[in-house]
Amino acid sequence: MASETAFQATGAGRIVISVDAMGGDRGPAAVVAGLAESASAIPGAYFIVHGDEAHLGPMIAKRKDLKGRCEIRHAPRVVTMNDKPSQVMRHGEGTSMWSCIESVRAGEATVAVSCGNTGALMAVSMIRLRKLPGVNRPAIACMWPSRNPGGFNVMLDVGADIKADAEDLAQYALMGASYARNGLSLERPRVGLLNVGTEEHKGRAELKVAQDLISANAAAGAYEFVGFIEGGDIPGRRCDVIVTDGFTGNVALKTGEGTAKLISDFLREAFGANILSKMAAVLALGSLKRLQKRIDPRRVNGGVFLGLNGTVVKSHGSADGTGVAAAIALAARLAQSGFHERLAARLASAGRAGQDAPDEMAAPGRSEKR
């Protein structure tokens, strides 16, 4: 193991983030680039980087921003995108992903970040970190660009588990509202249940049961339930939290990302069609840059695993350095806020007495809500 420095997981103004450097589509170079960008932006962050030391050592040594901020944990094996979660659960020890999660389990790091195989990452996280008491199915929550004043909605589940019964969906509502209340600085988040229509007679039987459960839990969860919502409401103003199963959520997420890229491509083609179009593009450059920033998936890269005994942030597998840095920034905010401990307290309190626990995390740059 190569180590430039030794550091503790906790301390005044100090956070330690465990990073899987090998699992992404772009390889360790993109992860190291993201680490360097994060080191400049987050002075109190230190990193335990897991992967092939022979590859990582020279890359990290070239980055001045990472000097004294990284410890390399050699992991000779990599979980690929084609590996089945069941195989990784049985034979994953020795991989960079397993080592990354193990650092959180051992208390060496506060939060883990990986660009790797989503199913495998959830499987390893569940077997090593275990679920919080009372949680049946953990969920992955993501931020979705929206027309709401804060600019984002929270959607879950977006891929942790393709199945979810009524009780799972009700628990997703509680966890999602808890995340949105503080991540988006919302006093009383509005929760919507995704369906094929807003009418009460529409949808599968379990959705109708979930509707009743989510409505009944609204007081304990300190949220407002707006009822069924449709796909068009995901980026809209009607709610702040979208609750759905992992299959539907993942399809919606990938469709949104693909649509954003399609719009970007169409605009590029339109403004490059002829000399007049190019002149118009120059005149509209400022507006186009603002639009690109609004729809850039890298800006909101990072899905949070909710319901585990530890915090895990899943970066998009194809993330570049900017995307990885966004995921690390999210991880740092969660670590600094103590979100995991506060969410666990909320779930325990709701399970015991149907009452809300003290709020979890304050939005970046904002005071903690009470």
From Swiss-Prot:
Enzyme Commission identifier(s): 2.3.1.274
Keyword Glycoprotein attributed: no
Lineage: Bacteria, Pseudomonadati, Pseudomonadota, Alphaproteobacteria, Rhodobacterales
Organism listed in the record: Cereibacter sphaeroides (strain ATCC 17023 / DSM 158 / JCM 6121 / CCUG 31486 / LMG 2827 / NBRC 12203 / NCIMB 8253 / ATH 2.4.1.)
Metabolic or biological pathway: Lipid metabolism; phospholipid metabolism
Catalytic activity of the protein: a fatty acyl-[ACP] + phosphate = an acyl phosphate + holo-[ACP]
InterPro entries: FA_synthesis, Phospholipid_synth_PlsX-like
Subcellular location: Cytoplasm
Protein name (record): Phosphate acyltransferase
Record-annotated membrane-spanning stretches: none
Record keywords: Cytoplasm, Lipid biosynthesis, Lipid metabolism, Phospholipid biosynthesis, Phospholipid metabolism, Transferase
Any one GO MF annotation of this record: phosphate:acyl-[acyl carrier protein] acyltransferase activity
Coiled-coil region list: none
Segments of this protein annotated with the region Disordered: 349-370
Family per similarity comment: Belongs to the PlsX family.
Summary of subunit composition and partner proteins: Homodimer. Probably interacts with PlsY.
Top-level lineage group: Bacteria
Pfam families: FA_synthesis
GO biological process per UniProt: fatty acid biosynthetic process; phospholipid biosynthetic process
Cellular component, GO annotation: cytoplasm
